[in-house]
């Protein structure tokens, strides 16, 4: 069976990364594509389920996993740990399922160092003005917070050149099509097709 592909997807806040991934998953069967589920030490919130939203673990268990090098990447955010389990990812990839990992550029660097075969995608907004409009449209932040987010977004976008693919999310449907096209092209790579169609190729080349 051909291995699945790990896709690292990064973008500044407001570029539409999460929306694109969720829209993609709705069009792909579960046995083809899944989203990575992180481990965390934070408390479970109402409506969240273990193994669906996060893998909820105690701090001691998380630290043990760090010591045993079980994480592709991990970080501490506001006193809670978050991390991506390498064994969990590899187990899914071994079944031929593609895995999408929504992560920032710093986490992406950590993962590429440990899994260079992963494919990475960066998503850009069509303009700074549109990015600011989307952030304001959420109605959650003050002008001061939005200005800070915009400054952070510019810093994040300077890392686009570290990625394999670049998508500009101006028209959502077109950006989603671009994302699907990347997946389709990766699945047609010779290394995967040789395994997938091994029996056919053997018959075609038999004397």
Swiss-Prot record:
GO terms for molecular function: ATP binding; guanylate kinase activity. It comes from the Bacteria. Its EC number is 2.7.4.8. ATP binds at residues 11-18. It catalyses: GMP + ATP = GDP + ADP. The keyword Nucleus does not apply. InterPro entries: GK/Ca_channel_bsu, Guanylate_kin-like_dom, Guanylate_kinase, Guanylate_kinase_CS, P-loop_NTPase. Pfam families: Guanylate_kin. Gene3D superfamilies: Guanylate Kinase phosphate binding domain, P-loop containing nucleotide triphosphate hydrolases. One of its GO terms (cellular component) is cytosol. NCBIfam families: guanyl_kin. This is Guanylate kinase. It comes from Pectobacterium atrosepticum (strain SCRI 1043 / ATCC BAA-672) (Erwinia carotovora subsp. atroseptica).
């Amino acid at each position: 069976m051909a291995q699945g592909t790990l896709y690292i997807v990064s973008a500044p806040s407001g570029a539409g990364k999460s929306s694109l991934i969720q829209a993609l998953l709705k069009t792909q069967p579960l046995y083809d594509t899944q989203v990575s589920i992180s481990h965390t030490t934070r408390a479970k919130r109402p409506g969240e389920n273990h193994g669906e939203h996060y893998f909820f673990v105690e701090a001691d268990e998380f630290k043990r996993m760090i010591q045993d090098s079980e994480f592709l990447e991990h970080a501490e955010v506001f006193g809670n740990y978050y991390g991506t389990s390498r064994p969990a990812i590899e187990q899914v990839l071994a079944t031929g399922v593609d895995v999408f990992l929504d992560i920032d550029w710093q986490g992406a660097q950590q993962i590429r160092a440990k899994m260079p075969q992963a494919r990475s995608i960066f998503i850009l907004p069509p303009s700074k003005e549109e990015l600011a409009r989307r952030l304001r449209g959420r109605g959650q932040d003050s002008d001061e917070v939005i200005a800070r987010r915009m400054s952070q977004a510019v810093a994040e976008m300077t890392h686009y050149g570290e990625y394999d693919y670049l998508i500009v999310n101006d028209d959502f449907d077109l950006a989603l099509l671009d994302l699907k096209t990347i997946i389709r092209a990766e699945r047609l790579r010779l290394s995967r097709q040789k395994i997938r169609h091994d029996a056919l190729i053997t018959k075609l080349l038999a004397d």
